[in-house]
């Protein structure tokens, strides 16, 4: 099976929900929520990106946005006052939008989005608490998955925008726009799977700096000890089992 580890995380889902939040600078209170969701067949990784379910809204907050966040996102207090909804309303919107799909997988790039939700919801409100619990239960951190396979020359994780460059992904919009970032996340997911040769080349690029490859290195060492040699194809085969 191609991408066996990824398949275990994704295959049961009927709906893949790629989402991104923006938050205030200091207290990480949610100020914008975007998602793009796609129906797929069970036991499949790939889906058609036609007829997506899209959602975006600003979220009102009493917290200070912060100058750095305002500069990066273009979101101001006036934006939230004029265009924002309460987080509770946003949660109701999203719940209604996705209600027909029992098996969902929520995908973001890094668990900061989960932390933002955790900091922002009213934990005494059953609707909001259940919303967070449902996402957390069915959550896949795509950043962590990629970090265990593809790193930079310093052994560090790549940003989602760096992956967009590597896979030559083009979407309208700009960084730190949650609609744009959600689409880039979806495109990166699809490119990672569809462009397998390119993906393997990215893994090889800084393979020696990837601390997560310990198990692969041990398996390769065992092959050398048992057979006296190991070829590049042996490494590729081991890596394919790790995808």
Model-predicted segments: where are they?
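N-terminal accessory regions of nucleic-acid-interacting proteins
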Residues: 1-19
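A generic local structural motif
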Residues: 2-5, 91-95
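Generic marker of residues within folded, mature protein domains
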Residues: 8-9, 25, 47
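Metal-dependent phosphoesterase core characteristic of DEDDh/y 3'-5' exonuclease domains
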Residues: 14, 28-32, 36-73, 98-229
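Broad, structure-driven detector of short, well-ordered beta-strand segments within folded domains
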Residues: 19-21, 38
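Short acidic, Gly/Ser-rich segments with clustered Asp/Glu that frequently serve as metal-coordination loops
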Residues: 21-28
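Metal-dependent phosphoesterase signature
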Residues: 72-93
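Acidic catalytic cores of enzymes that act on phosphate-bearing nucleotides/polynucleotides
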Residues: 224-243
């Amino acid at each position: 099976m191609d991408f066996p580890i990824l398949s275990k995380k994704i295959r049961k889902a009927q709906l893949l929900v790629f989402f991104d939040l923006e938050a205030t600078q200091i207290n990480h209170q949610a100020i914008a929520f975007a998602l793009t969701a796609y129906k797929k067949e069970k036991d499949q990784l790939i889906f058609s990106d036609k007829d997506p379910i899209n959602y975006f809204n600003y979220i009102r907050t009493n917290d200070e946005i912060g100058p750095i966040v305002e500069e990066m996102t273009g979101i101001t207090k006036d934006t939230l006052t004029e265009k924002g909804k309460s987080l509770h309303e946003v949660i109701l919107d999203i719940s209604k939008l996705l209600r027909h799909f029992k098996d969902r997988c929520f995908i973001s790039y890094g668990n900061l989005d989960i932390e933002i939700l955790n900091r922002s919801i009213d934990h005494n409100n059953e609707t909001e608490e259940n919303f967070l619990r449902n996402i957390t239960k069915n959550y896949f951190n795509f950043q962590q998955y990629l970090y265990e396979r593809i790193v930079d020359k310093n052994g560090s994780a790549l940003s989602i925008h760096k992956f967009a460059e590597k896979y030559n992904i083009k979407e309208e919009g700009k960084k730190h726009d949650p609609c744009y970032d959600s689409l880039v996340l979806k495109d990166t997911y699809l490119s990672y799977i569809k462009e397998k040769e390119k993906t393997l080349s990215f893994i090889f690029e800084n393979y020696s700096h990837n601390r997560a490859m310990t198990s692969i290195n041990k398996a390769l060492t065992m092959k050398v000890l048992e057979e006296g040699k190991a070829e590049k194809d042996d490494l590729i085969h081991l890596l394919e089992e790790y995808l």
